[in-house]
């Protein structure tokens, strides 16, 4: 049987009570958001005739999601992270701000406190038996298009199993493996030696993948490398590059791939190049320049503050 009660005064009054709108104390913004979200959910229960069994399955699911620390993983999977980027892009467009280097999502696996060095860093500890050497470098440009010395380039990525240090279920990786902060040199350049990452897959038995299965979706990301770039007078840029040619490049479960962020990994086998790059054998090279945008009225109007792991 289907009943309609959502629009009754009783239910509407109840939503205000449950959201604390009839209380003096508390936080008005939280009340406003909770009132709206509760209202939308109550309405969905009515419109879709969501059963008690379905509702309680949802409650159990949220508990599982938290117990597995996967809320930050389901979030990009459901497109929230990309949607927030779309909104920031639209705000920038409205302000006439051009992002020569597109932003894309941070993801849930950044860790603050990586080792810092000037100009160059070796990122991998050499322990990945399948690691193929990657030389990744480029120039950071300021908002006027000039090379920018002393910019901070934070880079993090996965190993050849798609696992990140600090989040590796095998426990194989040392702290901060494949996580570095490089300060650009006097020419605005950064350079790292690391290994080509593999794509990421959601934990196959976890609650995120469980829901994706119900949606008929996979939980894979293409091979990618994360960046934060920050510098005086500029907005912090959050982005990623994809290694070109990955089968998931244009089928990312987290919707982070964007035009301008797909970069070829060029294979070098000639002895000259191997010697010039001070590596032991054949290696891949990726070149990626990033251009920052200036502060808006002296502030970073889009910097994202979120709980992050700091070690
Ligand atoms: C990742 O490495 C990632 O970048 C995102 C967005 C989600 C899961 C794993
Ligand atoms: Fe990632």
Swiss-Prot record:
Domain of life: Bacteria
GO BP terms, alphabetized: beta-ketoadipate pathway; catechol-containing compound catabolic process
Organism the protein comes from: Acinetobacter baylyi (strain ATCC 33305 / BD413 / ADP1)
Gene3D superfamilies with a match to the protein in the record: Aromatic compound dioxygenase
Intrachain S-S bonds: none
Lineage per the UniProt record: Bacteria, Pseudomonadati, Pseudomonadota, Gammaproteobacteria, Moraxellales
Cofactors required: Fe(3+)
Protein name: Catechol 1,2-dioxygenase
Description of its domains: Contains a helical zipper domain, consisting of five N-terminal helices from each subunit, which forms the molecular dimer axis.
Sequence similarity: Belongs to the intradiol ring-cleavage dioxygenase family.
Class of this enzyme: oxidoreductase
Enzyme nomenclature, EC number: 1.13.11.1
Gene: catA
Reaction catalysis annotation: catechol + O2 = cis,cis-muconate + 2 H(+)
NCBIfam families, A to Z: catechol_proteo
Subunit structure of this chain's protein: Homodimer.
UniProt keyword annotations, A-Z: Aromatic hydrocarbons catabolism, Dioxygenase, Iron, Metal-binding, Oxidoreductase
Cofactor annotation remark: Binds 1 Fe(3+) ion per subunit.
Binding site residues for catechol: 164, 224-226
Xref: PROSITE patterns: INTRADIOL_DIOXYGENAS (PS00083)
Pfam families noted in UniProt: Dioxygenase_C, Dioxygenase_N
Binding locations of Fe cation: 164, 200, 224, 226
UniProt-recorded Gene Ontology molecular function terms: catechol 1,2-dioxygenase activity; ferric iron binding
Stored SUPFAM superfamilies: Aromatic compound dioxygenase
Pathway participation: Aromatic compound metabolism; beta-ketoadipate pathway; 5-oxo-4,5-dihydro-2-furylacetate from catechol: step 1/3
């Amino acid at each position: 049987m289907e009943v309609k009660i959502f629009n009754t005064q009783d239910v509407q009054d109840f939503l205000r009570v449950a959201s604390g709108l009839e209380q003096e104390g508390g936080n008005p913004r939280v009340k406003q958001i909770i009132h709206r979200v509760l209202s939308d959910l109550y309405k969905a229960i009515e419109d879709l005739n969501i059963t008690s069994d379905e509702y309680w399955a949802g409650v159990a699911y949220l508990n599982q999601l938290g117990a597995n620390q996967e809320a930050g993983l389901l979030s990009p999977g459901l497109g929230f992270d990309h949607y927030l980027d779309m909104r920031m892009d639209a705000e920038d467009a409205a302000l006439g701000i051009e992002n020569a280097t597109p932003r894309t999502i941070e993801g849930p696996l950044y860790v603050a406190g990586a080792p810092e060095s000037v100009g160059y860093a070796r990122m991998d500890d050499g322990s990945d038996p399948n690691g193929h050497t990657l030389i990744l470098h480029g120039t950071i440009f300021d908002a006027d298009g000039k090379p920018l010395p002393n910019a901070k380039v934070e880079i993090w990525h996965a190993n050849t199993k798609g696992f990140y240090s600090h989040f590796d279920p095998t426990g194989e990786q040392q702290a901060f493996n494949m996580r570095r902060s490089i300060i650009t040199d006097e020419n605005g350049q950064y350079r790292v030696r690391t290994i080509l990452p593999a794509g990421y897959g959601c934990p196959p038995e976890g609650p995120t993948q469980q829901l994706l299965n119900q949606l008929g979706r996979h939980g894979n990301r293409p091979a990618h490398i994360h960046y934060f770039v920050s510098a005086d007078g500029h907005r912090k840029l959050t982005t990623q590059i994809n290694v070109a040619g990955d089968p998931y490049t244009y089928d990312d479960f987290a919707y982070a791939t964007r035009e301008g962020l797909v970069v070829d990994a060029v294979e070098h086998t000639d002895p000259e190049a191997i010697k010039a790059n001070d590596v032991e054998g054949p290696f891949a090279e990726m070149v990626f320049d990033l251009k920052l945008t200036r502060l808006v009225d002296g502030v970073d109007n889009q910097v994202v503050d979120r709980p992050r792991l700091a070690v």
